[in-house]
Amino acid sequence: MKLLTPAQLHRLCVKEHYDIEVSYLEGPSARVISGCQDRTTKLVSWIHVEQHTMDRLSGSFRSESEARKCYDRFDQTVCVSQFVHDDFCRILNFRNPCRVLYNTVESDKILASASCDAPELMDDGRLRLMAVGTLKESKGYMRLLSILKRLRDEDYPVHLYVLGVGPLQQEMERYIRENGLQEVITLLGYQTNPYKYVSKCDLFVCASFAEGFSTAATEALIVGTPVCTVEVSGMKEMLGEHNEWGVVTENSEEALYQGIKDLLDHPDKLAYYKEKAIERGKSFSTENTVHAVEEMLLGGQ
């Protein structure tokens, strides 16, 4: 792609005139859409993840200079969280219109799916913890398993369910087996309807080393499941700077362990955060998020 200029790529890929053109991913698609030469077309760029460095941000472009020029051509840049927004603007010293709009999820469909039965979940009086996502290193699953071992050893009545598949699965299974955790950790694999499981758990847990604006945590709030998470991009926006709608700890195994343990030690606090999850989940309804995007696309800057 770098052999062609953005304008050449645009002529090759986009054959019609459009009133609005959207680059919904950073990098290559932004390079293509920025090549639009029709000044009557509104150009919009979406940024989903923190880039951290100019090298990473400009990796799909010929140079740092080209990356700056391409992003400067957009009439509106949209970031999925304040963390992503601040990171993007810092790297580019960006002064063009740039706003935060949260990802749209199908809240009505999620709530309907959440009502289905989930017989795989044990009804034995133990608190159910839930983690969701690809089984890979960046999701922090090994430290979450370590936390469950500590809780088991301290006789806390908990059971962790994990939804997802991925390259870390064999290592996780080996750790569970070697530490005798089969009775307190269940890997559910990939499920077409994760919501029926999340909605019936007492606490959603995120141990990730890095995230964008977590769709899984958003969906947990929508179905009314409290969230306890390490601090990654977007979580304080979602749950409050002072834990108004959920618990955000520093990004370490010990801090997450203490956060979960505190909720287990104080059932009234867990019940409080369930109410807050329901309240906060309404902010991410399809109606609200779609309206915000429509307003951005059809309105002014």
Predicted features along the sequence, with ranges:
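Carbohydrate-associated surface elements
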Residues: 83, 104
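An aromatic- and histidine-rich active-site surface loop
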Residues: 2-7, 20-40
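Conserved acidic donor-binding segment of nucleotide-sugar-dependent glycosyltransferases
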Residues: 241-253, 262-267
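Aromatic "clamp/platform" in nucleotide-sugar-dependent glycosyltransferases that forms part
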Residues: 190, 209
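Nucleotide-activated donor-binding/catalytic signature segment of Leloir-type glycosyltransferases, i.e.
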Residues: 173-189
